[in-house]
Amino acid sequence: AVDIPTIINVDRSYIRDIATRAVIDIENSNFDSAITKSRTLLEETFCYVIELKGEVPTTSGRIGDLYTQVKQLYNMHQSKDIDNRINSLLKGLEKIVSAIAEMRNNSSDAHGVGQKRYNIEAHHARLFVNSAATMADFILAVAMRKPSIEQ
């Protein structure tokens, strides 16, 4: 189990700050650190919105488990009652989480991987950072939305 610290506040400014620091890493050719920051940004955002619901984030250490918890708490499941384009985007979010987790686990500075390391390029690192920032912003927006009158 992994100890997940309580996040005091995650807001758009925080998301921009982490993303900016990751871009600086990219500009300094430190792609591994940028990928690690991408995952950290998602983990912290997921934990924050879980805690907003008064729940305790899972301590499994798997980012996919945190995202599953977020989806359950905020009813973010694909549905036949939702426009197919929205469902496609929600499915894409799953792939972002999975890809960032895999890349960080297999190619970043988080673990020694020896000769199996895949050296990514700057444009790939930017894709990871920008995808994580976009997803973090979306998750925050979902958590902060006002309930509609119908609910």
Residue ranges and their predicted role:
Residues 54-93:
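Short, charged amphipathic alpha-helical segments flanked by flexible coils
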Residues 1-34:
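Charged alpha-helical initiation segments
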Residues 8, 28, 35, 60, ...:
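Conserved phosphate/pyrophosphate-binding and hydrolysis machinery centered on Walker-type P-loop NTPases
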